Amino acid sequence: MQRVFIMVLDSFGIGAAEDADKFGDRGSDTLGHIAERCERGDANHGRKGPLKLPNLTRLGLAKAAEQSTGRFPAGLDKQAEIVGAYAYASEISSGKDTLSGHWEIAGVPVLFDWGYFPAVENSFPPKLLEALVARAGLPGFLGNCHASGTVILDRLGEEHMRTGKPIFYTSADSVFQLACHEETFGLERLYSLCEIAREILTDGGYNIGRVITRPFVGAKAGQFERTGNRHDLAVPPPSATMLQKLVEEKGGTVVSVGKIADIYAQVGISKKVKATGLDALFDATVREMDAAGENTLVFTNFVDFDSAYGHRRDVAGYAAALELFDRRLPELMSRVQGNDILILTADHGCDPTWHGTDHTREHVPVLIYGPTVNPGFYGHRTTFADIGQTVARYFGLSPMDYGKAIM
């Protein structure tokens, strides 16, 4: 049986990329810096001691990181038996965002420039805001700035609840984000507002990658929490990804777990499974692996590494989440049988020790495991698209335009 399971540890970079200077990210290293803080005893909130990732280390994670940076991650086992193929990959896409990373993984790098809202304050063009207020019948808006999603809720959440004005904000990524209270504003109303914003941005030629709803609950500042009802409206990839080819050329099945379907604008997705939180995402992935038939790709994004810990610069939280993932990893590995292959990778970095709150331009790990996979180092991959090309070859699809098959 031909089956592939891809797990994206969202934001899990393993060292600054060659072009990190262009992004202000030279010296960033998500894994390395987390491991250093753990080794020093500076990440003991909710966990304790050196970083413990025995299963990822056996798949080659630490050795891939050493090849990327020249340094073996602090506290990890140098003597571990390697049971998987490992490599590290550079990104050729123009950005360090979620869409660019995932599309490149699927064989379609973003070689054009996204549109951005670079101004930190008064970030959005008045024409855009006026159109959105008019079409949606809004009493106004709040925010209109770059912000951390949790910080802006504490700053503006109460005023939003009192006035009914949605909170608009952005970041260094190509995104337009809308935060509204699920109860006082309404979830369906927020989704409708998101669709209107997507239409205006697309029709206006702003070239913005994603419009993201950020629903939240809570009664006052300090109590607000974002819920799992986030919804992303992305533009579709500019050409066929290996997901789309699997469905169209082989009649295969692509199962999205988490936010994968949104990232690819639903294109090439056969089934969508929603889950919130690392354990729930793991549980859903295990169920879908058990149910997977011939010519099936199960594709999971573990977003919490990025959204809950990377952007929030929470080193201890990120470390604890990695250790949770590692403890549960054998559940995935034990389900890889026959010709199956399991691929673990990331879409960008988000070093929780780095300045600011944005992503970091880093190499990502490429870890491949399966009964037919020969363990060892498979080099420096010069594009994430090598993953897509590998999957295309595995399923017997037409070749992707970018990337070289790893095996």
From Swiss-Prot:
Q: Name one Pfam family in it.
A: Metalloenzyme
Q: Name one GO molecular function term.
A: manganese ion binding
Q: Which cofactor does it need?
A: Mn(2+)
Q: What class of enzyme is it?
A: isomerase
Looking up CDD domains in the UniProt record yields: PPM (cd16009)
Residue numbers binding Mn(2+) 1: 10, 347-348
Free-text remark on how the cofactor is bound: Binds 2 manganese ions.
The reactions it catalyses are: 2-deoxy-alpha-D-ribose 1-phosphate = 2-deoxy-D-ribose 5-phosphate; alpha-D-ribose 1-phosphate = D-ribose 5-phosphate
HAMAP family, alphabetically? Phosphopentomut (MF_00740)
Q: What does this protein do?
A: Isomerase that catalyzes the conversion of deoxy-ribose 1-phosphate (dRib-1-P) and ribose 1-phosphate (Rib-1-P) to deoxy-ribose 5-phosphate (dRib-5-P) and ribose 5-phosphate (Rib-5-P), respectively.
Stated name of the protein: Phosphopentomutase
Q: Which organism does this record belong to?
A: Sodalis glossinidius (strain morsitans)
Gene (UniProt): deoB
